[in-house]
A protein has these predicted regions:
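Beta-strand-rich structural segments
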Residues: 1-9, 88-101
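N-terminal, post-signal-peptide region of Sec/Tat-exported proteins
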Residues: 3-40
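Short amphipathic beta-strand segments in non-cytosolic proteins
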Residues: 22-33, 110-122
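Short beta-strand segments within Ig-like beta-sandwich modules, predominantly Fibronectin type-III
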Residues: 35-39, 121-126
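A surface-exposed beta-strand-loop module
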Residues: 37-53
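Glycine-centered loop-to-beta-strand initiation motif
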Residues: 41-46, 125-139
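Short, aromatic- and glycine-rich surface loops/edge beta-strands on solvent-exposed regions
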Residues: 48-63, 140-149
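Beta-strand-rich domain onsets/edges
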Residues: 64-95, 104, 117, 159-175
Length: 175
């Protein structure tokens, strides 16, 4: 797992922001079982996954008065959402997705697609939460969506006034 800004070729370092935000990630394999880190480098954490299917990571991060609920998924074979906010393919390997928030389609939400060669395009989910993207080049694609809920609460003794859910989906295209 790498953390950073794909479009800017930025990978956060363990002795910088990555070390501050990646405190206790929950990583699950396709079977839903938790994975433990097997290796760490200056800018990554490795989680061994066996078998086929998507791997998910979730990590809450509090920034001032906002609780960030970060979720990431690698792969587009699972057609059922498991994260609070998740782009779910309509069929395994499909370029049509439904943006789910807590199990229900999320309409009229911006989804940004990043792809080679540093290409970026914004889409909006329709009234049924669906988007259809194009993947014109071979290589890695990253999709990102966010949703804010005005909901106050506390975590680890710190108050927040809203929750910002951020979800990324990463997959590779071969042609």
């Amino acid at each position: 797992a790498y953390f950073g800004e794909w479009a800017d070729d930025l990978r956060e370092k363990r002795d910088g922001l990555l070390g501050k935000v990646l405190v206790a990630p929950v990583v699950t394999g396709a079977d839903g079982k938790a994975l433990k880190a097997s290796a760490e480098g200056a800018d990554f954490v490795e989680f061994p996954a066996s078998g086929k299917g998507d791997v998910r990571l979730s990590q809450p991060i509090q920034f001032k008065e906002t609780l960030m609920q970060y979720g990431a998924k690698a792969g587009r074979s699972d057609t059922e959402g498991k994260l609070d906010l998740e782009l779910v393919p309509a069929a395994a390997g499909s370029n049509t997705f439904v943006l789910h928030f807590k199990g229900k389609p999320l309409a009229k939400t911006e989804v940004t697609v990043f792809g080679p060669p540093k290409w970026e395009k914004r889409f909006h989910s329709d009234e049924n939460g669906r988007i259809e993207i194009t993947t014109p080049w071979p290589g890695q694609y990253v999709l990102e969506a966010a949703h804010v809920v005005e909901e106050a609460g506390q975590t680890d003794g710190k108050a927040y006034t809203k929750i910002r859910y951020v979800s990324t989906l990463t997959f590779n295209v071969t042609k």
